[in-house]
Regions:
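Solvent-exposed, non-transmembrane regions of integral membrane proteins
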Residues: 3-897
């Protein structure tokens, strides 16, 4: 008898055949429907999200032991993975399919459900185009990885074997040309000048530069790195990478298709929203806290709003105090201020620092910020309290060291540092010491630095790092003070090429340094001014004033000359930079956004009666308009600051982490202002102002903690083409929209259970949160793909599972999951907003968290912000628990009714 599993279809009767066909059709249709179902697609995206996060942590755990590439391959190349629950040594693990299997299943699900089963109508045309682009992208990545052949420098341990690839050409390196920024070892660019010998015969010259590969005979040659030839000292070697991938350009065209499809779809959705929205062009505006039957009584509502106002005011007050710490002036006898003309002239001088020309005011400002944590300090003088600028501090260090050594400009944050260096104790938590106090403990500091350096740079405590930083800042100030001493003891030593050792120069090439004065006379010229100034300190009356005026005249004459060596364009750039730091755009925007937010809250609290005078009834919409215009003004300040930075640096406005903060603040508020024109509820404007204010405050604190000039030029790999600029700007714009949606959802989750908003307002918030999330998805998805294209164009790797890449992918996967669950009707309004809050946490991880993991190409090694980031995670966790409790209580209140 034949097994039931292997029936002979030809011997069955007609009735049996029909029954079997029906069974096969039934189960086949069920399998087909399941393979293309929403549920399976959502589950696969969540699995991809979990795998991406777990794989990132896997790299952190094993990269130091087995290498980054091996750690990546051991997780993302596995057929299945076991993710430990509860820690690395947990006995319970979550089994999941590997990344490759999951991607194949997602491809099949998207092909069946997103192309074959979807209705082919103009309404779904954008979705179809986007799905087609994603399918091409997945196919290009999966097939391209299998078909790619890469030849590069390989370290081969003894006993291992290597595959040999014959290239259809030979290369000869004629010359390798590295270029560095002036005065630094930071590479600006490097190129290999080669001669190519094809198999077909002949030869021709070519150049391979960083970010500018050479394509020939189906192969792509990338400039990877360079080094010193160990066999021939003084000779340079060029490290190239050869890659052969027939599908190299598929991700690029796929990303264009995805962008067109998403923009098309969301434009159609937005158009339908505008057509459905009643009274869009009607006059008047509605602000938060609309009255309706289901809302709280008026008195309780106003008390709750007042409590929220006080809480927000307290948060911003503490933040602004932290951003601008209070001054503790010290009495400095015999202090006489520098003339304003001298300070302005000295601050406008051009110096070479960090590979670029910058004003002395910027140079001194960051040194003071690094030493004291702020850009100015207050001293007590015989004429009263006086605020000293960085330039005045620097001039005092150079020409009046007996005064400068009294200034308490060295900030110490940790008690352990005070005890280790035997410094005098102070009551303040943030202790400030003078140069004279540290000089008395010079031996202890030197001994501590020597012991710390023996430990290496890794695994140092925060106190040890602070001691090293304190010693470096002390050495800088000591070097400035030596200028005056050397000029007095040996004026001839201050020659043309000697002075720049103590004070950076205005020239680019080392040949135009301080060219205004004769070589031998420069030292004597400045020594005379310094000697006159120091003599005047011990005198009184008209004689001292005359000497000071003579000394300042000499200094003015000397300091006025170096800028003549700068070109007109350089002088304009210096003037812009001086204006930029005088403007202090982040602090101005912070104050403006807080003022606009307070105005908006006052509008919500103020509710005139129906029979009130006309002028009182217009106060509320007038206040709302004032808040909108004030927010627009703060956004304009940030936009102007970004434009000024572009003109100074001559690159895109987003080139480092600090610039992303200002860009997110600007774009987040701008997006809220635009949405507010359509919603007219005031809530999205409040969310945008909160986002802008928090971002500005974070930027101020971040700059103070890092104390690094973020306008310094970028390294060679980041001086790229259009793709890099597009990638960074696009994805950061997606960050801004995603964070705006998260802040808006925070407001909803807090206001809805407290009955501060009406039912119609809740529906409007749902639509706004959904629309902003869609906007964020467009830019995060396209920006992530653009980043892969840039990597493929620059060094031949589209995707390498780097933590920064994984963070961007996590954002995209989460937003796609939320939108698809919402489309399926499985996500209530509360869950949509709760998901946006979780999305905000994921954006924070991708934006900041991955920078602190210590692995990957984008690990910046930040340590001072880890505690703040951990506090943010805990704060969001507590808020999520609070939102759940409030929602549960609101549901119980409805059930009781």
């Amino acid at each position: 008898m034949q097994s039931a599993l292997f029936l002979d279809y030809g011997r069955l009767t007609l009735m049996d055949r029909e029954r079997m066909d029906a069974v096969l059709k039934k189960y086949g249709c069920s399998l087909w429907n399941f393979a293309g179902s929403y549920g399976l697609g959502i589950a696969l995206m969540l699995i991809l999200l979990v795998l991406t996060f777990a794989g990132t942590l896997h790299q952190v755990r094993l990269s130091s032991a087995m290498g980054s590439e091996a750690a990546i391959e051991s997780f993302f190349g596995a057929a299945y993975v076991l993710i430990p629950l509860g820690g690395e040594n947990s006995l319970i693990s979550l089994p999941l399919p590997g990344m490759g299997i999951t991607c194949v299943l997602l491809f099949a699900n998207l092909l069946i459900g997103g192309v074959f089963r979807i209705r082919w109508t103009w309404r779904h045309a954008g979705v179809l185009v986007a799905h087609g682009g994603i399918l091409l992208l997945l196919a290009g990545i999966m097939l391209g990885n299998k078909m790619t052949v890469a030849v590069e420098q390989v370290e081969l341990p003894q006993g291992d074997r290597v595959h040999e690839y014959s290239l259809p050409f030979d290369l000869r390196l004629n010359r390798f040309v590295p270029e560095f920024y002036p005065g630094t070892s930071k590479p600006k660019s490097y190129e290999s000048q080669i001669t190519v010998f094809p198999e077909s015969g002949g030869q021709y010259d070519a150049v391979i530069r960083m970010n500018e590969p050479l394509r020939l005979s189906g192969w792509t040659l990338y400039q990877m790195s360079w080094g010193q030839d160990s066999l021939h000292p003084g000779r340079l070697i060029s490290i190239l990478r050869a890659s052969h991938n027939p599908l190299e350009q598929m991700p690029k065209w796929s990303s264009y298709i995805i962008a067109i499809g998403l923009l098309w779809h969301f434009a159609c959705v937005f158009g339908r929203y505008l057509r459905r929205k009643p009274g869009l062009a009607s006059a008047g505006t509605a602000v938060t806290a609309e009255p309706q039957a289901a809302s709280a009584p008026g008195g309780k509502k106003h008390l709750r709003l007042a409590g929220i106002c006080l809480l927000v005011a307290a948060i911003f007050g503490v933040g602004m105090l932290a951003a601008r710490p209070a001054a503790h002036p010290v009495l400095v006898k015999n202090y006489v201020p520098w003339s304003p003309a001298l300070v302005e002239r000295a601050g406008a001088m051009a110096v070479l620092d960090g590979g670029r020309l910058k004003p002395v005011s910027t140079y001194a400002g960051f040194h003071l910020l690094r030493t004291l944590g702020k850009r100015s300090f207050v001293v007590d003088t015989p004429e009263g309290k006086r605020k000293l600028s960085p330039v005045e501090w620097m001039l005092d260090c150079m020409f009046r060291p007996e005064l400068a050594e009294q200034y308490p400009v060295f900030l110490v944050n940790r008690e352990e540092v005070v005890r280790r260096l035997h410094l005098p104790d102070q009551k303040d938590k943030r202790k400030k010491y003078s140069y004279a106090q540290l000089a008395e403990r010079w031996e202890e500091m030197t001994r501590a630095v020597r012991e710390i350096r023996l430990l290496g740079e890794t695994n140092l405590t925060e106190a040890q790092k602070e001691i090293l930083s304190l010693a470096r800042n002390f050495d800088v100030m000591r070097g400035w003070m030596l200028v005056s001493r050397i000029m007095l003891e040996n004026p001839a030593a201050m020659e043309r090429m000697e002075f720049p050792r103590w004070f950076p120069s205005a020239g680019r090439d080392g040949e135009r340094l301080w060219t205004a004065a004769p070589d031998k006379a420069a030292g004597a010229f400045l020594a005379m001014a310094s000697l006159l100034e120091r003599k005047a300190i011990g005198m009184e009356g008209a004689e001292a004033s005359a000497l000071r005026m003579k000394a300042e005249g000499l200094l003015l004459e000397k300091l006025a000359q170096p800028n003549e060596a700068a070109s007109a364009g350089e002088r304009h750039s210096l003037e812009r930079e001086i204006f930029y730091y005088r403007l202090d755009p982040l602090y101005i925007s912070l104050a403006v956004f807080v003022a606009a937010f307070v105005c908006l809250l006052l509008c919500a609290l103020f509710r005139p009666a129906a029979n009130a005078p006309l002028w009182r009834r217009f106060l509320r919409p007038g206040g709302f308009s004032l808040a909108w215009l004030t927010g627009a003004g703060g956004t304009g300040v940030l936009a102007a600051a970004l434009v000024i930075r572009m003109l100074i640096t001559m690159r895109s406005p987003v080139g480092n982490t600090y610039e992303t903060i200002a860009f997110i603040a600007c774009m987040g508020v701008l997006c809220a202002l635009v949405v507010e024109l359509f919603s007219k509820k005031g809530i999205v404007l409040a969310a945008g102002l909160l986002l802008g204010a928090f971002s500005c405050q974070m930027g101020i604190l971040y700059e103070a903690s890092q104390a690094v000039d973020h306008m310094d030029p970028l390294v060679a790999i980041l001086r790229s083409n259009f793709l890099l600029s597009t990638h960074v700007i696009t994805i950061v714009l997606g960050y801004a929209a995603g964070l705006l949606a998260a802040v808006l959802s925070h407001i909803y989750l807090l206001a809805s259970p407290l009955r501060l908003i009406s039912g119609k307002t809740e529906q409007s918030l749902d639509r706004m949160a959904y629309g902003i999330l869609c906007f964020s998805l467009v830019f995060t998805l396209v920006g992530t793909v653009f980043g892969g294209i840039w990597g493929n164009e620059s060094w031949g790797r589209f995707w390498g599972w780097d933590p920064k890449e994984n963070g961007a992918l996590m954002i995209v996967l989460w937003q796609l999951t939320v939108l698809h669950v919402r489309k399926a009707g499985w996500l209530s309004s509360w869950l949509l907003h709760f998901s946006n809050v979780v999305g905000g946490v994921i954006i924070a991880f991708a934006w900041w968290g991955v920078n602190m993991l210590g692995v990957g190409l984008h690990s910046y090694g930040f340590t001072s912000g880890r505690d703040a980031l951990d506090m943010f995670y805990w704060f969001e966790a507590v808020l999520c628990v609070l939102f759940i409790i409030l929602h549960y209580r609101a549901l119980r209140r409805v059930d009781v009714r």
